[in-house]
């Protein structure tokens, strides 16, 4: 009787949603410095899609992608050290160590064919991860990142920006997050993201931002020979021709009118572009 009841519930669920539930399994693995890294894994397939969040975010920001892409790929969403459910016992939150976090997960899962997908700061992180993972990586997808590989900010500008976060982290972060949404954005989504990111541990967030500001991707890019696609909003200019000096196989797809968190703002449109980009990388 219980079996029949369960089957009836499953049929009702599939009829209502048009799909099966994707059950993500949460695991942990230690990074190179011993910090525990939490990640979710779901789906099957020869190719792994590894999603890396941005500054002061976590793996839940990819919730609109995990279920869809788990039908055909092994989907992995990672909490970098100091974020989400991962350990917070790291002294300095560098892009290089974040890259080690990603590499530790991929190597632990023994995935030999990977596309790395990184949002915002995650774009820098996956460059470092690609360097460490070598020929396991078939391509890189940035999400509203890689606007310019060349840093045009002075040290004074960087330090001044960082000081505002150091002096009043919550207020500055909320204002910073709101500025990255378009004026017509869903106010509940804006509030949710602003509240979430401003609740990050300030010392970790400031460390990560400082290291991001002083991170130079060019040396890493010059040693990578990988196709790179970026899906960006049109709020910020992208130095396409300048970037092509450092990445020969480079493409940008724009979502007009979207903000920085495009995978949350317009998930269906974003998922279409992501699906297209994955297909392009796998067919190169």
Question: Where are the language model's segments positioned?
Answer:
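Conserved alpha/beta-hydrolase catalytic His-Asp/Glu region
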Residues: 150-156, 164-223
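Gly/Ala-rich beta-loop-alpha elbow adjacent to hydrolase catalytic centers
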Residues: 118, 122, 126
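Flexible "cap/lid" loop of the alpha/beta hydrolase fold
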Residues: 127-132, 136-168
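Conserved loop-alpha-helix segment in the C-terminal half of the alpha/beta-hydrolase fold
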Residues: 227-264
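Alpha/beta-hydrolase fold catalytic core
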Residues: 1-50, 72-73, 199, 279-284
